[in-house]
Swiss-Prot record:
MF (Gene Ontology): GTP binding; ribosome binding
Annotated protein name in UniProt: GTPase Der
Binding, GTP 1: 9-16, 56-60, 118-121
Taxon lineage: Bacteria, Pseudomonadati, Pseudomonadota, Gammaproteobacteria, Alteromonadales
CDD domains: EngA1 (cd01894), EngA2 (cd01895)
Amino acid sequence: MIPVVALVGRPNVGKSTLFNRLTRTRDALVADFPGLTRDRKYGRAFLSGYEFIVVDTGGIDGTEEGIETKMAEQSLAAIEEADVVLFMTDARAGLTAADLSIAQHLRSRQKTTFVVANKIDGIDADSACAEFWSLGLGEVYQMAAAQGRGVTNMIEYALTPYAEAMGIERQGEEEEVDERQYTEEEAEAEQKRLQDLPIKLAIIGKPNVGKSTLTNRILGEERVVVYDEPGTTRDSIYIPMERDGREYVIIDTAGVRRRSKVHEVIEKFSVIKTLKAVEDANVVLLIIDAREGIAEQDLGLLGFALNAGRALVIAVNKWDGIDQGIKDRVKSELDRRLGFIDFARIHFISALHGTGVGHLFESIEEAYDSATRRVSTSMLTRIMQMSQDDHQPPLVNGRRVKLKYAHAGGYNPPIVVIHGNQVSKLPDSYKRYMMNYFRRSLKVVGTPIQLRFQEGDNPFENKVEKLTMSQERRRKRALSHIKDRKTK
């Protein structure tokens, strides 16, 4: 399971700066939920081969009213659900009463905590950081988040216990493409392995869109899973099931009750739990409330699923009982706001009455099969060549970008690796054209497809061309002819 790193500290110690650096963007919102957390941010980060979820919990002032009352409920939940806490302090401002209050709270929770002294640029870092040892939380790690100093070392150290689980051997910071090409036998064996595994299905959506109702509808009336027992709040519930001879694992993030009790409880909603479920799933089923239309929360969750490369099916719930005018408006909004995911199937259902629920699994299987389908190197190369025939790559410095061959780079999501010369200079518009061309040609449905470009080495680069004997004779005759003309 992907680890969660929570950034904790009083205001203005650099949490947002570190968040933006880890997520590599200044607009790295994955899910920002008004009404649940006023200023919390969730992002997906990659650093030194590690993949993790990072949470900016917002500032805590630690006033006399007490740390428990000043820390928002969702910030408390973020700390409780985090695997690692980075307790950020300001080396320039020194140790404050708020820092002491936060440290006391973290000690009581017995979380894996690392003290980070930020803003060490331009000062005597060792002297400035010395007083933070008195917090009693172990070693103090020096960092200048704005400049990136100490960030990589900090994350590597904090996430080392998760390296084996993530299959990490020391890698560089940049993600590398696996250039290994499967043989036909290996590719067939890998596809069979994937097809034999249960499909892990994450049912996600904002609160009260009907996730629990749908899960109970899928599992049947008698299935009961109590979601508020000790130990069930941190991780999602994994429920195995079988349908039409196909095995599934339903990843439930809402907590499941008897259908008769669904309306009697307020759904517990955990953003982190939802994001972790997306990372662990093969297929994501996003539930949208037809009565409310597409909300920003829906787009945030959708963005996270797409960034994770997960196969996707969308279900518009509560479709029964609304008039035709509202249905037309919702369909128009779906076309307008979700046009960029035209590869995903959209279903209109009623989880309460079961209308349309059975058809969801046709699209779920279709999306998973598309995401794990094996395509040979010869087929991918042929499609690549056809795309060039229909629309040539652009000229770069007077030379045409040359694409040589393509092969599969991974499954779920499907990854196509394209080798060629000057591919790094291909404009984004041409890359999008190729991605859409591959999608249409392969009839990929319900899953994003990724293209990766590898620069091919030119074997003649920096080498003097060696002429054949006939070429050498022609060259001498040409030079002799030029000399004769100059002497006349």
